[in-house]
Amino acid sequence: MRDFAKEIEQRKQAGLYRTRRLIAGPQQPTLTADGRSLLSFCSNDYLGLASHGENMRALEQALPEVGLGGAASHLVCGHHEAHHRLEQRLAAFTRRSSALFFSTGYMANMGVISALAGRGDTIFSDRLNHASIIDGCILSRARVRRYAHGDVAALETMLSETSGHKLVVTDGVFSMDGDIAPLTELARVCKAHDALLVVDDAHGVGVLGPQGRGSVLEAGLCQEDVPVLIGTLGKGVGTSGAFVAGSDVLIDYLVQKARTYIYTTAMPPALAAATCASLDAVESGDERRAHLDALIQRFRAGAQDLGYELMSSRTPIQPIMIGDNWTALALSRALEDEGLLVTAIRPPTVPEGEARLRVTLSAAHTEADVDRLLRALAKSRSVLSEAVAREPAL
């Protein structure tokens, strides 16, 4: 029998042990974590809609009409008209023929990928894709080939060497780096080599593109270019759940084949009603997005002036690259001492030697909030200097 306690201790010794913070109250920039009020820069609530009044009122109004629980799977008696309205709304929002509502983004990726590929097929996956994509690839039992991050030329070479059914899967916005996939080039090579392109736009929906419709539409691509679009509703949209959007045939096929859709209880229908209201806020949220963009630019300019290493990202995800696990944890603790919550991200979430602080900005933040973060980063800069001083001479 494996010694689980020993494995946990090894994680602690490597600076990889993870703990949960106990949050009280609503998700908003200033929240209560473990009983302490902190200004948070680690939420994915990019537009500040998680506690939006109209969305909560829509939920309250729907509850007496539809009840609380989903009660059954969608293919038994759990597919409520509220779910159906949301799917129609998501199809229109993404400019696609149909959409299918999943309980979580993880379930959407696992269910879609394992339904669209199997033994004898080949999946091509960006090396920095999300864990749910990786697990979907494993579950499919297809052959999996990983291409270097964003390297379309390398992908095209792989595609040219491969026959049979081919699936190319990529994040639209990469969750730990904040950069955007080269979607136009990916669509081109997939068409040229008869490969089905799947884009998980979990971190693009709500933030990028016309009226927040995501990275695919921002790139000027349509359903024909990107046949399979996956998105989540718990980030930019501010509620919960996920979806896949595409052709009528695709959605019908997934209803028949996606096990994570078939064999689970439907999400609460009242939540679907609240999500429809939130999509209205997303579509009318150009001022929110403009404010968010201004905050991103303000943070980047200030952090770079302080000498911090940032990644090339124009999205709300702004990683501060550290490298060493312990140094990342120390900087996170130093910021918390200043009343800020900024999480250290370590392997296996990111590659070895690439630990970082993942700063995420929200339209609910103010300029004063960002300035407070920058002041704390300036005060905590000595943490990095001390780490460099501890490094052994070569």
From Swiss-Prot:
Domain of life: Bacteria
Pfam families reported for this sequence: Aminotran_1_2
The protein's annotated pathway: Cofactor biosynthesis; biotin biosynthesis
Catalytic activity: 6-carboxyhexanoyl-[ACP] + L-alanine + H(+) = (8S)-8-amino-7-oxononanoate + holo-[ACP] + CO2
InterPro entries: Aminotrans_II_pyridoxalP_BS, Aminotransferase_I/II_large, AON_synthase_class-II, AONS_Archaea/Proteobacteria, AONS_Proteobacteria, PyrdxlP-dep_Trfase, PyrdxlP-dep_Trfase_major, PyrdxlP-dep_Trfase_small
Single GO molecular function: 8-amino-7-oxononanoate synthase activity
Keyword Repeat carried by entry: no
UniProt keyword list: Biotin biosynthesis, Pyridoxal phosphate, Transferase
Binding site for substrate: 18, 130, 349
EC number: 2.3.1.47
Modified residue annotations for N6-(pyridoxal phosphate)lysine: 235
Subunit structure and binding partners: Homodimer.
Protein name: 8-amino-7-oxononanoate synthase
Organism: Marinobacter nauticus (strain ATCC 700491 / DSM 11845 / VT8)
